[in-house]
Amino acid sequence: CRNTIVRYMKCLKKITNMAIAKEWMRKDPFYGYKMEQDETDPVFLTNNELQAIMNREFDIPRLELVKDIFLFACFTGLAFADVSTLRPEHLEQDNNGDWWIRKGRVKLERRRKSSSIANVPLLPVPLAILKKYESHPICLKQGTCLPVVCNQKANSYLKEIADFCGIKKNLTTHAARHTFATTVTLANNVPLQEVSAMLGHASTRMTQHYARVMDRNLKDNMNIVRSKMGL
């Protein structure tokens, strides 16, 4: 599909950029070439699926850890890279005693665009997870808030978690951020502009895609109702 082609072309472009920087190539073969991807719907959990994971306790430590990391992202909207680099200095308490995450997004910082800040009030679920791991040896050694495993391992373990919880979706770390944007916030009538601010989006245009997905899902569900009732 076009998106797969674009993904490979982006990798190739990085290589050619490196070659140009080292003067191995004189001209940019990608000059004037536009990479356009097809819009795809993000994978996210429904409320029932989210509750299924929350209510499941694992005897296997690696699964319990990844479950907690995933739920933390579901209730904060942080990308996996931001969760793994979250440090105590990114946590702030306001005058009312409530805790917030105020953190520049990692992806944008690497591009030297640190103006995009994830600004998220902490709900009881992520607060409890932070408390659970505050004395974890890895956290104490690295100065991080959570002992996050690598993305590849996390995605592998999430597939096991999905199987245990009877979830048929392709569960990855990306699904947590998508779940926050849809099931946790927009589905509970949090204004689009506020969701955009918490996600650290540069504009609400980036967030509107989630709202369109919610509308399509609602329409599909109503079509099922119409079919069952013979309307």
Report each predicted region and the residues it spans.
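Basic, Lys/Arg- and aromatic-enriched nucleic-acid-binding interface segment
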Residues: 2-10, 21-80, 84, 188
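Catalytic-site neighborhood detector that most strongly recognizes the C-terminal catalytic loop/helix
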Residues: 37, 44, 105-107, 127, ...
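Conserved tyrosine-mediated DNA breakage-rejoining catalytic core shared by Y-recombinases
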Residues: 34-43, 49, 85-131
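C-terminal catalytic core of tyrosine-transesterase DNA break-rejoin enzymes
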Residues: 71, 75, 81-82, 160, ...
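DNA/chromatin major-groove-contacting recognition/catalytic segments
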Residues: 56, 115-118, 212-231
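Short, polar N-cap/turn motifs at the start of nucleic acid-interacting alpha helices
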Residues: 90-98, 168-169, 189-209, 220
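Short basic/aromatic active-site micro-motif
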Residues: 7, 65-66, 148-152, 168-188
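Active-site/catalytic core of tyrosine-dependent DNA strand-transfer enzymes
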Residues: 121-168
